[in-house]
């Protein structure tokens, strides 16, 4: 994992299939204050058993989508992270 600095506790919200796989609508997780989006995704997939939908997940940090997995994400204590799989239906 490419992470620097201290660790903070963030709130994680799960939607749709990610909620089903994680078996909870919300959780808390410790993350580095500075981490690449790719490493963050790997951490969340591993921690919450989301491997089956890994390639289709969208992450949002404090209600802003993380568009590029090479981006660095900066966290503060109590930040919010949403895990959003693509919605399906008709």
Swiss-Prot record:
Residues recorded with modification Glycyl adenylate: 90
Subunit structure: Heterotetramer; composed of 2 small (Mocs2A) and 2 large (Mocs2B) subunits.
Source species of the chain: Drosophila erecta (Fruit fly)
GO biological process: Mo-molybdopterin cofactor biosynthetic process
Gene Ontology CC annotations of this record: cytosol; molybdopterin adenylyltransferase complex; molybdopterin synthase complex
Known pathway: Cofactor biosynthesis; molybdopterin biosynthesis
1-thioglycine PTM positions: 90
Gene3D superfamilies tied to this protein: 3.10.20.30
Function description: Acts as a sulfur carrier required for molybdopterin biosynthesis. Component of the molybdopterin synthase complex that catalyzes the conversion of precursor Z into molybdopterin by mediating the incorporation of 2 sulfur atoms into precursor Z to generate a dithiolene group. In the complex, serves as sulfur donor by being thiocarboxylated (-COSH) at its C-terminus by MOCS3. After interaction with Mocs2B, the sulfur is then transferred to precursor Z to form molybdopterin.
UniProt keyword Phosphoprotein present: yes
Subcellular location: Cytoplasm
CDD domains according to UniProt: Ubl_MoaD
Further comment: This protein is produced by a bicistronic gene which also produces the large subunit (Mocs2B).
Keywords: Cytoplasm, Molybdenum cofactor biosynthesis, Nucleotide-binding, Phosphoprotein
GO molecular function, one term: molybdopterin synthase activity
Family: Belongs to the MoaD family. MOCS2A subfamily.
Pfam families reported in the protein's UniProt record: ThiS (PF02597)
HAMAP family: MOCS2A
Protein name, per record: Molybdopterin synthase sulfur carrier subunit
């Amino acid at each position: 994992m490419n992470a620097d600095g201290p660790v903070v506790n963030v709130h994680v919200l799960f939607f749709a299939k990610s909620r089903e796989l994680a078996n909870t609508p919300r959780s808390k997780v410790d993350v580095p204050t500075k981490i690449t989006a790719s490493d963050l995704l790997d951490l969340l997939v591993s921690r919450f058993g989301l491997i089956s939908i890994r390639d289709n997940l969208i992450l949002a940090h404090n209600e802003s989508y993380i568009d590029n997995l090479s981006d660095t994400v900066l966290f503060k204590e109590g930040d919010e992270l949403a895990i959003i799989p693509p919605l399906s239906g008709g």
